[in-house]
Structure formats: C-alpha cells, structure tokens
Amino acid sequence: MIGSINESPIEEHMNDSPSTKEKADSVDISDYIVSHSDDSLSKDIKKDTKSFLDVEHGEISTVDEFEEDSPYPEVRAAVPPTDDPSMPCNTIRMWTIGLIYSTVGAAVNMFFSLRNPTVTLSVLISELLAYPALQIWDLIFPDREFRIGRLKFNFKPGPFNVKEHALIVVMSSVSFGNAYSTDIILAQRVHYKQRFGFGYEICLTLATQLIGYGLAGLSRRLLVRPASMLWPVNLVQCTLIKTLHRKDLRNAVANGWRISPFRFFLYVFIASFIWNWFPSYIFQALSLFAWVTWIRPNSPTVNQIFGESTGISILPMTFDWNQISAYILSPLMAPADALMNILLGVILFFWIVTPALNFTNTWYGDYLPISSSGIIDHFGNSYNVTRILTKDATFDLDAYQNYSPIFMSTTYALAFGLSFASITSVIFHVILYHGKEIYDRLRDPPAPDIHEKLMKAYDEVPFYWYLSVFLAFFGMMMGTIYGWKTETPWWVIIVGVIFSAVWFIPIGIVQAITNIQLGLNVFTEFIVGYMYPGRPLAMMIFKTVGYITMTQGLAFAADLKFGHYMKLPPRIMFYTQMIATIWSCFVQIGVLDWALGNIDNVCQADQPDNYTCPNATVFFNSSVIWGVIGPKRMFSGKNTYTGLQYFWLAGVLGTILFWALWKKWPQKWWGQLNGPLIFGGTGYIPPATPVNYLAWSGIGLFFNYYLKKIFADWWQKYNFTLSAALDTGTQLSVIILFFCLQLPMVNFPDWWGNDGAFNTLDATGAAVRKLVNESAGEFFGPAEW
C-alpha cells in the first residue's frame, strides 16, 4: 500500500466514524515501575549517556551524579537523565534548516493531499534527513563570529548538536500536518461555489490551528510535567536522535546481543526499506494476505468472514509494516495493557457482535457489506449525494423522500455506537481513576522527577503568553465568521471551544499514557447536526473548532513533552512552534490556491492526473449528511440506527463496572479492563479492518509484554530503536516508490500476486449475500423514511 494516512481515512463518505483511541489505567501501574537496583542495563545506559549531551560542551548539569532517573523503564530506555544548559540551540543553523524543512514538508503534503493515492512526508523522515543536512552545513560554514553594527552572529557556533536537531523536529511536527481548514475551503470553492478570498482562508486557518496551542500551554501542569504522562510517541523520536548523535556510547551486552544501537538501526532500516518494495510494489498480496478468500473468491460469506479489505479478518495475516502501523502508529510504542484492551475490543465487537448483527439481518445486513466506510442507498449502490441537493447545494426533502435513506455496513454503524460510548466512558474513566490525582496536582504539585528538575535551569513560558495566544486566535475566529458570510453565529464557536476544553484533559491523559487518542469528530458532527441543522458551512466550522482545537492542542502538548525530554528551553520552544505553525499556514494556503488556479479539473472525479481531492470530497459529503440531512433522520424516532443511542449509557455503565473490578481486584487481569480503550480504541474501523488492529496488538504484545518481561535488557536497549528503524525505512521506501514509480505510472509486470489475488469479492467490495433488482423496482429497507 503506497501512501500514508493523513487524518483518519475513516472519513469515508459519512466522514469519520469514531476517530478514537485511548486508555488509561492508574498511573501507578506496577508494570511501569521497575526497581533501579536490579536493572543492570539501566545502570550501563546511565553511564553511557553521561556524555550524551556534552559532545561539544564540558560538564553536564546533573542531580546526584546520575543516580536519579525516571521511574519508567520506557523513559529510561530513550531519554538520558542529563542536560547541558550552555548548549546553543537558538542558532541561525537551526532556524534556516528548520524553516526549509517546514516549507518543503507543508507544501509537499498539502499538494499531494489533493491526489489519490497520496504520499505524506512524516516527521520521522524529517528527523532522519535533518542529520545529514546539519552535517553538510558544518562543512560549508566556518566557526566564526560576524558583526553587523552591534549585532553579532555565528553561522556555526560549534558542531551541530542534539538540541538544534530536536528543535528542527518540533518545527516539522507542527507544520507537516495538513490544516483541517483546507478541507472547508475546498468544499466551499469546489462544491458550494463560494470563494471568500485569501484573507478569509488565512484567518480561518490560523485561528483553527492556533487556538489549541493556548489550551496546550495552559494544561502543562497536568499533561506535560508529570513523569507519568509518558507520551510514548516522543520516546521513539528521542531514541532516534540519541542513536544518530552518539554512535560511540559504551556498548553494553544485552541478553547476549552486542551490536550497537546505531548499527542495529542501520541494518533494520536497510532491511525494512528493501522489504517494503515487495508488499507495496512487487507482491502486493503480501499486504493483506487473505489466503482463505483466494480459495473461495466468489463466496460472499467466506469473503465477509475471512476477508481483510471489507471483511472481519478471521485468521488475519499481513506482511506489510504499513498495514501494521499506518492507523495507530508503531505497536512498539504502546504499553502492554493498552494493547490487550484494544485486542479485547476488536475480538468482542468485531469478531462476536458484528457477525451476530450482520447474519441476523440487523440493520439490513444481508444486503450490505459487513465492513465498509461508504454510505449506501436502498438499491445497494453508493449513495448519490447530489440527488438530494438543490442547484444551490441545499437539502431537497422531496428528492430525499423519493430516493433513499442512508445505510451503512455493520462495522460502520457499530463504530458510531462505539464512538458514543467512548465519549462518555473517557469522562467517567478520568474522574474515577485520575480524579484525585488531578485534584492533588492542582492543589499541591508533587515532587518533580529528574527531567522536571533539569528543566528548572530554564525560564518557563509565562501563563499569560499562552492565554494571550488563545484569546488572540479565538478573537480572530470570531472576526472570521462575522467578517465573511459564513452563516455561523457566535455561540457556535463558543460551544465548539467549550467542547474542546472539556475533553482536552481527559483525552490528553489517556493519550499521554497509552499513545491512543479519542477523537471528537463524530461527536461534534452529531451535536451540531441537532443543534444547528441545515447549515453545512456552520457544521464544518463547528467541527473544526470543536475537534481540531483539541487535536491540534494535544499535538502541541506532545511536542512540549518532547521538548521536556530533550531539555529544550521552553521560550525557544514557544517561538519555534508559533513561527513554524504560522509560516506553514501561509505555505499551505499558497499551495492550495495555486493548485486550484493551475490544475485543470482539479477535484473532479475524471481529473486525468488523479488530483481528485479525496479528503475534500469526503468532507463535503459529510457536511451534507450531518449539516443538511442531519442525525435526526438517522438516529432518532423509528429510524434504522436509533438503537445506537444506547451506547451513550453503555459507556458510562461499562466504565463504572471496570472501575469496580479494578478496586476489588487491582492485580487481576479483569481489574485492568479499560473502558475508553475497549470502546474507543478501534476507531479507525472502518476503513481499517480487524487485521490492522490484530497484527498491531499481536506484535506489540510480543515486544512490550513478552520480550520486556523475559529479555528486559534487550528490550531496553533495542525496542525503540527497532521501532524508529522500521518506520523510517518503510516510509522512505514509500516516498521513493511513489515519486519514482507510482507517480509516473510505472507498474510492475502483471502477475497473480498483484492481480489475481485481488479478484475476490472481499477485495472488490462486493461481498454481499443478497442483491435487489433495481430495474424491477426492488429495494430493501423501510417503506417510508
């Protein structure tokens, strides 16, 4: 599978099914706490990392001669308990390379997001390529101070260092992701024929991207500083920087393995780069190895049960790291209890509940695929949204009643229910499991860990800086909706921001511990559909403010934790995040406007170069369904999916039950059940299928439970290095394949592994047990709607 996932590809037609994820357990889980006294490799690593941050500068600031370290083995494996406050990082070198990378990444990702299939430059690729860029800079520029009047500067204030490298990673992180507002702009300009101009586009983008930054800064006491807020995604980035910069660390033997982390990274990187050519290009059947469907390719039941494209993946197999890590990142980053809870959720809801519903014809499952993210009419065809719109793109009730209600596959409908359950579950989970901890931390912060102690060497960003950012861009958002004819009242923005703020801490805690984020996308669409129906633009704006404010804010919080681990001065972090984000907004809007003005038939289904704007099309369809048709016609009264409303209550009751089991039997496996993860951890199904989650959780449990328990030294030395190597090798291979072969339409010679293996009902999306004869006037579903 060439390409990568931007937001949640789950936004297929009806847009997102629950883009969820999360977890949480008591922060004091014994699985995370490891005694220092018997951790020999940990001691070796402490000795080795003693010089990690002083490559260029003498002594390192430490506490108690390195005897103090993080209580979490994950952090000890990736982050040295050291710092050198004198290390320069606010340098011309850092700003130049960082802004170049931000510009290229934002422009490339924006441009190719308009194409199907797409390709995405990831932050890990930026992190990897920044290393040789910094080396080349040092070869070109002298270490010499220049003066212009009273201004002094140096292009090379010593050899490049880890802090400069880390700040470039931060700038890439905030600029590489496509702004959600660009989908609003595309929907307006292409489908609704509204063009408000560059001023509107840039104000909308800046406001929606940066309101969340204020929330991130205001939540530092709860989401960034506590040692228990691990943010596992950062540990891989820290490990990669450490691996690249310190090839000479003392090479302690780990369970018989003597190879250095750098050489280990290099070998795995090369192997994954080469291997990806097979499932992505040479032998694509390796990606979704649905071998049972090859035996019975035309059996709807076999393809529904064993299929891996539109089935429920019984006997799952994949040999493609893209399939394993594309939706919820590398499994080597997730804690074992999070992996187990998500695995339980997949088995319960998609191996037991889904076939039980589908094969009893619940929600007319006989006539629908068992797993698909499309919306379907009562003839079994893709739902034709244009048939229910007037010429000015407003809802035509008569046309709707003369056409068809909306139907969904069983997994898609169930995913909405699970999204409802996860929204209520996360609130009750955080109150029950973490409420006292939050209260105590706000009232009397606990003693800092070693990393927080080391950060005291730097001036903190004042509270009012973040508050000012929040208020400034909130004001810009208000000015945007009234400065242009958006038909969006002020209270829609306020309610959207309140939604983000209320769920920011609960979802942030879960994400910081488990690396799984629960999304508010479905919830915001659902609420605005009831609250302000018939206003598609208002729906899109509310969703962006209510959902992206939280998502973007949590991404900023994750970067703040990365800076915390890498001992980056907080005020320099503030400047780099703000400047890179603002600059990337201008870059993305510039690229978008250029593409709309210079690519013929852009965003049209017949565009010859495949610049069909798939995300924007899905976003438009979503605005019609939620903003025009509205959830009332799907989830209320006697409509087909009304029963899904009970999942709100299921999320509450399930979480209370799991909490009671935890209080009674905290050491038993049933005491570790986690409501938000069980209900919401599978939020990318569909378009993901169970094979993505089963392979992900299986590999994750092998490394983060079995190897961590049996071969702890090996795990601590190599686990995150392995994750970084697999990700970067695969992603770089995907990029080269895309630009060198896929973009110029150079296909591998036809053979069964790229052709015949996909001639199944599962692969073609046609695994349906019953069909209707539309020409004879047959249809399924209710007689009236």
Curated annotation (Swiss-Prot):
The chain crosses the membrane at residues 94-114, 121-141, 167-187, 196-216, 264-284, 339-359, 413-433, 461-481, 490-510, 512-532, 537-557, 572-592, 611-631, 642-662, 683-703, 732-752. Keywords: Endoplasmic reticulum, Membrane, Peptide transport, Protein transport, Transmembrane, Transmembrane helix, Transport. It is found in: Endoplasmic reticulum membrane. It holds the Pfam family OPT. The keyword Membrane applies. Residues 1-28 are annotated as: Disordered. This is Sexual differentiation process protein isp4. The lineage of its organism: Eukaryota, Fungi, Dikarya, Ascomycota, Taphrinomycotina. The gene is isp4.
